[in-house]
Amino acid sequence: MAGKSAREKIKLVSSAGTGHFYTTDKNKRNTPHKLEMKKYDPVVRKHVTYRETKLK
């Protein structure tokens, strides 16, 4: 049986307030801080900052 994974599923939410989000996973041992990256938001058709939130 596989052990508990170090990777955790997360949701990256757009800071533009459009409600658009991406889902991904990250290694919580290597990156304990919250991710923040620039990605394309198709609603506003621009690259904006996406911040990590918990995936429910």
Curated annotation (Swiss-Prot):
One of its GO terms (biological process) is translation. This is Large ribosomal subunit protein bL33. The keyword Transcription regulation does not apply. SUPFAM superfamilies: Zn-binding ribosomal proteins (SSF57829). It comes from Halorhodospira halophila (strain DSM 244 / SL1) (Ectothiorhodospira halophila (strain DSM 244 / SL1)). Keywords: Ribonucleoprotein, Ribosomal protein. NCBIfam families: PRK00595.1 (NF001860), rpmG_bact (TIGR01023). One of its GO terms (molecular function) is structural constituent of ribosome. Pfam families: Ribosomal_L33. GO terms for cellular component: cytosolic large ribosomal subunit. Belongs to the bacterial ribosomal protein bL33 family. InterPro entries: Ribosomal_bL33 (IPR001705), Ribosomal_bL33_CS (IPR018264), Ribosomal_bL33_sf (IPR038584), Ribosomal_zn-bd (IPR011332). PANTHER family: 54S RIBOSOMAL PROTEIN L39, MITOCHONDRIAL, LARGE RIBOSOMAL SUBUNIT PROTEIN BL33M.
